[in-house]
Amino acid sequence: GLWETIKNFGKKFTLNILHKLKCKIGGGC
């Protein structure tokens, strides 16, 4: 349903931001 799609998108979005933060703090991916 729509809710699952929204939750999925939110999870991907959050993981993406966390990944970028980790790259900045860690100095590379």
UniProtKB/Swiss-Prot annotation:
GO terms for cellular component: extracellular region. GO terms for biological process: defense response to bacterium. The keyword Secreted applies. Expressed by the skin glands. Keywords: Amphibian defense peptide, Antibiotic, Antimicrobial, Disulfide bond, Secreted. Its main location: secreted. It is found in: Secreted. The keyword Lipid metabolism does not apply. Disulfide bonds join C23-C29. It comes from the Eukaryota. Antibacterial activity against representative Gram-negative and Gram-positive bacteria. Belongs to the frog skin active peptide (FSAP) family. Brevinin subfamily. This is Brevinin-2Tc. It comes from Rana temporaria.
